[in-house]
Structure formats: C-alpha cells, structure tokens
C-alpha cells in the first residue's frame, strides 16, 4: 500500500538512525544495508538525520558506504558534508549554538540526581558525571555545571538512569524550559536544542543549499531549492519539484516527518509519532525502513521501464 504514496521524481531521503536503520542493540540488518545501496544506485540523495553527535554518527554512515554527501547531526544543530579528503573525513557547513546556562539551571533543579551534559561542537560531551556504560558513544569529560554553562553549545542533555520515563517527562514539563526545542526519548533522556532548531529546519536549509548549488552549476532542470509547499514536495527556482521522504521513530523526528513530502513512521514508534506521519511501516525488527526503501526502488524501476 505504501507504494501508492511514493513519488516518481528524484528524491532526497532523510533517515533517522536509532530505531530506524539500527535496532535497539545498534545492529543493522543485511536487508537494510542492501536497500540503502540500491536506493543510492537509483540516484537518491540519502541524508542521515540523527540526534547523534558527529563522532557517533560517522561510523553509521561509513557502515553503509556513505563517505560523501550530507548528514544532519545533533537533531539539526549540525550539518556536515562528508568528504574523504577533509580532515576527519568531514566538513561542518552549518552549526547552531546557544547559551546553555538557563537550561542547565532549570534541569538540575528539576532532576537533582540526573546527569547533565553539553555537546561541544566536534569535541564530544562535558558531563556532570559519567553516563551508564554504552549510552554515550562520544568522548565525555566530567566538569562542573559552571564550566558547562560557560560557553555556547549545540545541545544540552539530561539523563536520569532508573527513573520512569513518565515521571521524568512530568518533571521536565514543569521545570520552566523556555526558548528552546526539546525531545524526550524512549528512556529518561532529554535533548535540548537551540530555539527553532530541529531535523526539519536543517533539512530545509540543506535543500535550499542543494538547489543553489545546482543553479550555480547550470543544472536548472534538476534544481532542488526547497521551499515548504505543504505535503506535495519542495519546489525549486524553476518550478521543478524535489520529492522528499523522511523515516523516523522518535519524538525528535516529528517535525521532520511533517516537513517531508512523505513522512513515514516506524511501526515501533510511539503513537504521537505515527499520528504525525503520512504512512506507517513495519517495526525496526521487521525491517520496516528497508521495506519502504525497497518500494521506492521498485517504483523507480517501473518508471524507467515505462
């Protein structure tokens, strides 16, 4: 049924990582890897769009053979261009930071036993105490809350190991966070981003950048400058429509799913995420994302044969 929704034109496909292309154990199925390779071979732009920081996201991209192209990290606060010739294999092309002092103060008051952390652009995390083993892939350095609040950051994180996620959500809702974006995950984990910064805002800016690049290169017929036009795609300078598909499973994916021409929620997603999508695919443990991408590939094959 999903195939009926899929566009025929050239695509930008934004994919969440955890719970979408990776399962809860951090594993990627062979089918998922094969689907991504086939999709890229059909000319689609695949953009990893994740809450992970750079150092945690790059290995995922490399695992599926993405060593060039674009990636959205830190829930939209960082956009990077992967380039094998650049130092570290990437170049940060856009980043948004904010003063974390108010968020740190509010969160540490609301959940005194929680772990507070801030993400430093390209430099891992400063943490109030170490995270549980395996939860934070990037480097972490224990510092005081005062030091955390001393410079702009791309993200503030609050983690409360052992706390029920519903209790955690209530405490966060009542703590007085203002002028920021925030999303709560499957566990008692909170990401706080600069105001107005989401995966969707970063993808919108990226689509505009790609369109401008195409215009400068003289490829007007393939211009991909995106301006939000509802749920029918994103229209470039020349009137050409760039179709966009996004797949995700978390609260931090809701804006991205609404932004995309087709937003697909994983079957394992919370109901609020499903309600924000156009279609719902199978859960991650049944390769729901791969099934959707396979349908896209099959649709483009039929188009090319017609």
Regions found by a protein language model. Name each.
Residues 110-221, 233-247, 251-253:
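Conserved acidic, metal-coordinating active-site core of Asp-based
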Residues 30-133:
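Active-site phosphate-binding/coordination module
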Residues 64-67, 75, 176-178, 259-260, ...:
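Short, structured coil segments at secondary-structure junctions
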Residues 43-47, 67-69, 155, 242-243, ...:
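Short active-site oxyanion
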Residues 94-96, 141-143, 280-284:
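Short acidic-hydrophobic, aromatic-tinged amphipathic segments that line or gate anion-handling sites
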Residues 3-4, 8, 12, 29, ...:
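Mg2+-dependent phosphoryl-transfer enzymes with acidic/Ser/Thr/Gly-rich catalytic loops
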Residues 32, 57-61, 168, 172, ...:
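Hydrophobic packing residues within well-ordered alpha-helices of enzyme cores
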